[in-house]
């Protein structure tokens, strides 16, 4: 049985999903002339994944406590209020509300 490498068949590289393009777009909005190294991008990607998992976990717990089987924008908003400190939570909630409104009206 020949190994994959010597088989002549190209082994398709598994596409790794990341928030890279979105992080880059936000960077260009705030600092148009600033670049980002791949190491810094990797750190930012880990950060976004970490915050996403924390919010999702907290929202999941909130839904369970209230005997609900669905996470709604309300659970996510409460999770954000619990996880983020003061002013950061305020801004995150207003941006989230704005995004949900934009999504609802575009449907």
Curated annotation (Swiss-Prot):
GO terms for cellular component: nucleosome; nucleus. SMART domains: H2B (SM00427). Keywords: Chromosome, DNA-binding, Glycoprotein, Isopeptide bond, Nucleosome core, Nucleus, Ubl conjugation. One of its GO terms (molecular function) is structural constituent of chromatin. It is found in: Nucleus; Chromosome. The keyword Kinase does not apply. There is a cross-link at residue 102 (Glycyl lysine isopeptide (Lys-Gly) (interchain with G-Cter in ubiquitin)). This is Late histone H2B.L4. It comes from Strongylocentrotus purpuratus. The lineage of its organism: Eukaryota, Metazoa, Echinodermata, Eleutherozoa, Echinozoa.
